[in-house]
C-alpha cells in the first residue's frame, strides 16, 4: 500500500532529491562538462537526463559508465530495480551555459593559465556564442597574500526585477590552487529567442519592437474617385400627390 504524503512534503522531498542528485553528478562528471540535470517522472519509471558538453565520456565505453551511474542512483535513492533510466544529452549552446563556462574557467586556472587571460578567453567565447552580456568574477589570493577580487564585464547585464530569474544564468565554482581557494562566479545574460531554444520566449518588459509600415501599392493607371460628396436627394415634381402611409 502506497504511503500518502501531503503536497508540501512531496515538493520538499522532490527538491531534496534533485539537489542531492545534482551534487552527486557535479562531483562525478565535473571533467566531462556536466551542465545540469532534468528529472521526468512517468507512471512506470523515472527518467534522468544528464546535460553535458562531452556526452561520449558520460556514456563511457559501450555504455559502461552510464550503467554504473544508474546502479549507484538506484541504490542511493531506493528506486525499485529497472524503474530508473539515465540518459546523456549534449548541451546545444555551450557558450550560453554558465555551469559549463565556470567549469571551463576552473580547469584553465588549474592548468596554470593566468587569471586575466583565462577570464578574457571565457568572456570572448560567451559573447561570440550570442549572449547579450556576461560577468566573470574571480576572488581570492590572486597575487600576493592579500585576497582581492577581479571582475570582467562585457555587454548588457540586468541585476534586479523578475526578468533576472529567467534571463540571467548564474554558476559558482571553487578551485583549490597552491596559494589557496579561489572563487569563480559566472553570470550570462541570455538573448531573447521567440522559439525558446537559446533563450527565454518572453521579451524584456522595456523591449520596444518597431513595426515596419506596410508597402503602399501604387495604381498602374490613373483613377479619379470622388470622396466626401453628399448624396443627391431626388427632387419631387410639382403637383405630384404626396404619398400617405
Curated annotation (Swiss-Prot):
E.C. number(s) listed in UniProt: 4.2.99.18
Keyword field: Apoptosis, Cell cycle, Cell division, Cytoplasm, Cytoskeleton, DNA damage, DNA repair, DNA-binding, Lyase, Membrane, Mitochondrion, Mitochondrion inner membrane, Mitosis, Nucleus, Ribonucleoprotein, Ribosomal protein, RNA-binding, Transcription, Transcription regulation, Translation regulation
Membrane topology value: Peripheral membrane protein
Domain named KH type-2: residues: 21-92
Gene Ontology biological process: apoptotic process; cell division; DNA repair; positive regulation of apoptotic signaling pathway; regulation of translation; translation
Reaction equations catalysed: 2'-deoxyribonucleotide-(2'-deoxyribose 5'-phosphate)-2'-deoxyribonucleotide-DNA = a 3'-end 2'-deoxyribonucleotide-(2,3-dehydro-2,3-deoxyribose 5'-phosphate)-DNA + a 5'-end 5'-phospho-2'-deoxyribonucleoside-DNA + H(+)
Listed InterPro entries: KH_dom-like_a/b, KH_dom_type_2, KH_sf_prok-type, Ribosomal_S3_C_sf, Ribosomal_uS3_C, Ribosomal_uS3_CS, Ribosomal_uS3_euk/arc
Pfam families: KH_2, Ribosomal_S3_C
Keyword RNA-binding applies: yes
Chief localization: cytoplasm
Any one of the GO CC terms: spindle
Top-tier EC class: lyase
GO molecular function, a single term: structural constituent of ribosome
Function: Component of the small ribosomal subunit. The ribosome is a large ribonucleoprotein complex responsible for the synthesis of proteins in the cell. Has endonuclease activity and plays a role in repair of damaged DNA. Also involved in other processes including regulation of transcription, translation of its cognate mRNA, spindle formation and chromosome movement during mitosis, and apoptosis.
Protein name listed in UniProt: Small ribosomal subunit protein uS3
Species whose genome carries this gene: Ictalurus punctatus
Upper classification of the organism: Eukaryota, Metazoa, Chordata, Craniata, Vertebrata
Amino acid at each position: 500500500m502506497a504511503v500518502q504524503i501531503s503536497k508540501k512534503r512531496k515538493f520538499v522531498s522532490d527538491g531534496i532529491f534533485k539537489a542531492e542528485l545534482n551534487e552527486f553528478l557535479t562531483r562525478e562528471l565535473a571533467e566531462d562538462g556536466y551542465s545540469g540535470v532534468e528529472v521526468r517522472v512517468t507512471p512506470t519509471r523515472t527518467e534522468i537526463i544528464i546535460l553535458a558538453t562531452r556526452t561520449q565520456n558520460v556514456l563511457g565505453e559501450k555504455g559502461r559508465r552510464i550503467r554504473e551511474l544508474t546502479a549507484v542512483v538506484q541504490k542511493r535513492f531506493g528506486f525499485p530495480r529497472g524503474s530508473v533510466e539515465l540518459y546523456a544529452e549534449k548541451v546545444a549552446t555551450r557558450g550560453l551555459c554558465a555551469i559549463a563556462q565556470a567549469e571551463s574557467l576552473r580547469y584553465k586556472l588549474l592548468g596554470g593559465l593566468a587569471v586575466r587571460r583565462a577570464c578574457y578567453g571565457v568572456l570572448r567565447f560567451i559573447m561570440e556564442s550570442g549572449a547579450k552580456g556576461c560577468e566573470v568574477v574571480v576572488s581570492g589570493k590572486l597575487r600576493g597574500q592579500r585576497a582581492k577580487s577581479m571582475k570582467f564585464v562585457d555587454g548588457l547585464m540586468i541585476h534586479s526585477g523578475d526578468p533576472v530569474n529567467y534571463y540571467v544564468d548564474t554558476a559558482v565554482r571553487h578551485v583549490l590552487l597552491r596559494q589557496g581557494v579561489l572563487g569563480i562566479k559566472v553570470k550570462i545574460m541570455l538573448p531573447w529567442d521567440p522559439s525558446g531554444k537559446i533563450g527565454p520566449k518572453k521579451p524584456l518588459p522595456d523591449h520596444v519592437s518597431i513595426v515596419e509600415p506596410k508597402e503602399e501599392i501604387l495604381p498602374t493607371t490613373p483613377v479619379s474617385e470622388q470622396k466626401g460628396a453628399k448624396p443627391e436627394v431626388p427632387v419631387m415634381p410639382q403637383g405630384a400627390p404626396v404619398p400617405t402611409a
